[in-house]
Amino acid sequence: MTDVALALVALVVMEPVTAVLHRAIFHGFGMGWHRSHHEPPRHALEANDLFPVVFALGTILVLSIGVWIGGDAVLIPVGIGVTAYGASYLVVHDVVIHRRLPWPRIHNRVGHRLRAAHNVHHLFGRAPYGFLAPVVPRDLAARADARGIDRTRRTIGTATDSVSA
């Protein structure tokens, strides 16, 4: 497998890995940090911002080992794929969805779908845990619809029941 293909595979595999990590860590023992993301923002930075720092350090370690091993080490393209996923997540999640930096709203089907899925996650503190290809469980979509909530326009991070449901 070429390095480019390996990097692309790593990028794609990161979506289910991220979903599992989000469910197990962010909404598990890491909820102390992650809770700040489900509450109204009080500062430019939130405790939840420590997660990408920790994950970036892990990726830097993988890339460093790949460079140290040299030769045909698969760690470098894997590290590049993981880094590409992390950069995509940062731009889509923090910039486009949460608008933590000035950025125009994205008005297309993909942006609409990503915002709607992420809003459901913030509303109920449950799935979808993935991000670039989220699947909203039917029961949660129906629950939001039954409450008359426009899942695409909800202000993210202000739901009163965001982590209690």
What annotation goes with each model-predicted range?
Residues 1-165:
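Hydrophobic transmembrane helical bundles of multi-pass organellar membrane proteins
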